[in-house]
């Protein structure tokens, strides 16, 4: 089977930002939809929605219309959505019946679009491919029972889990099957045990800094193509002298931090270059950040915790509080 596989999308990210929603829908229309007809199946690896306990009406409406358009345009292709932790009302297993897909899509939608299948309450087995909802990988007892029930019936698993933390016992239960998972937003590869987190389909915060995001063709269990997301915003950091060689391609459609050391921030050539960049690319989200080697000299999921907290607030603060936040941080700095 030739599958188009899509990692976490998190529609409703940035406190239901409509600007972000527009970019994400554009990504689906411009980059995903043209690829679908060349595949047998389309697999969503979970967390299609972001805010598990409350889905914004406009977000739900736009995403439902997007799915309707995709499904109606590709009646011969089978679509599978695997529920992730953000797709359930609660992370507690006793609330697993409350999920985003039944709420937003509804029973009539699913009855009409017979080529859409949701793995939220039970696993789905299709052509030796086992699709496991969040609760079936994160609950060890359920996982073990499921592996034994379907033993010998699958060669490929799609799910929503953190493969890096799978125990030897858990790996052994799956046998020789390839595992491709959503949940972790950056790629993780364990070739020896055939475990792969594919990463999110979009970059969302500065935890995703300076790295691209992809969707994939997986043909009979093997990745054969990777398609870079060039539609939704990228997150970039550039340090000190690098600001003097920045081009339009480095800055357009990005959230960018110019990381300048205390020794450089007051130098005239740096001040002039920063002023030039901001005036030339006024539509870009460009911020200047003081860079200290022992705090911010590296990027990614393990970055300095105080920096991460600042960035989280910066990226998620409601718009009506943004000016107050900027004034407060200006006083502190």
Where are these regions (language model features)?
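Conserved beta-sheet core of the metallophosphoesterase superfamily
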Residues: 163-226
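Conserved catalytic scaffold of divalent metal-dependent phosphoesterases
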Residues: 81-172
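N-terminal active-site segment of His-dependent metallophosphoesterases
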Residues: 1-65, 76, 143-153, 331-333
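Accessory, non-catalytic peripheral segments of nucleic-acid enzymes
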Residues: 220-333
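Short, conserved loop/helix-junction motifs that constitute active-site signature segments
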Residues: 70-75, 150-151, 170-176, 251-252
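Active-site regions of enzymes building and remodeling cell-envelope glycoconjugates
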Residues: 115-117, 127-129, 154-155, 171-180, ...
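Active-site neighborhood of phospho(di)ester-bond hydrolases with catalytic His/Asp-centered motifs
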Residues: 6-7, 41-47, 78-85, 117-121, ...
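Metal-dependent catalytic neighborhoods of phosphoester/phosphodiester hydrolases
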Residues: 15-17, 46-67, 83, 88-109, ...
């Amino acid at each position: 089977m030739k599958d188009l596989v899509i990692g976490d999308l998190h529609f409703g990210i940035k406190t239901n930002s409509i600007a972000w929603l527009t970019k994400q829908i554009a990504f689906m229309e411009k980059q995903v939809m043209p690829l679908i007809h060349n595949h047998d199946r389309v697999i969503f690896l979970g967390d299609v929605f972001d805010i598990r306990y409350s889905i914004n009406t406009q977000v739900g409406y736009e995403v439902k219309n997007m799915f309707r358009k995709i499904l109606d345009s590709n009646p011969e292709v089978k679509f599978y959505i695997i529920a992730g932790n953000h797709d359930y009302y609660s992370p507690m297993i006793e609330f697993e019946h409350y999920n985003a897909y039944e709420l937003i899509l509804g029973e009539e939608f699913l009855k009409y679009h017979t080529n859409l299948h949701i793995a939220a309450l039970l696993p789905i087995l299709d052509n030796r491919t086992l699709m496991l909802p969040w609760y079936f990988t994160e609950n060890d007892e359920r996982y073990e029972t499921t592996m034994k029930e379907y033993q010998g019936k699958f060669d490929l698993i799609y799910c929503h889990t953190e493969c890096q933390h799978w125990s030897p016992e858990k790996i052994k239960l799956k046998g020789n099957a390839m595992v491709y998972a959503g949940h972790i937003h950056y790629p993780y590869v364990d070739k020896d045990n055939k475990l792969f987190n594919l990463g999110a389909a979009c970059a969302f915060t500065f935890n995703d800094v300076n790295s691209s995001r992809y969707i994939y063709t997986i043909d009979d269990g093997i990745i054969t193509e990777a398609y870079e997301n060039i539609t939704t915003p990228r997150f970039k950091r550039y340090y000190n002298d690098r600001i003097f060689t920045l081009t339009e391609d480095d800055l357009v459609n990005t959230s960018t931090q110019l990381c300048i050391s205390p020794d450089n921030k007051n130098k005239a050539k740096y001040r002039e270059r920063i002023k030039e960049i901001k005036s030339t690319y006024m539509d870009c989200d460009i911020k200047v950040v003081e860079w200290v080697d022992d705090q911010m000299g590296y990027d990614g999921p393990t970055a300095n915790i105080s920096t991460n907290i600042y960035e989280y607030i910066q990226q998620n603060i409601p718009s009506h509080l943004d000016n107050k936040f900027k004034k407060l941080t200006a006083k502190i700095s």
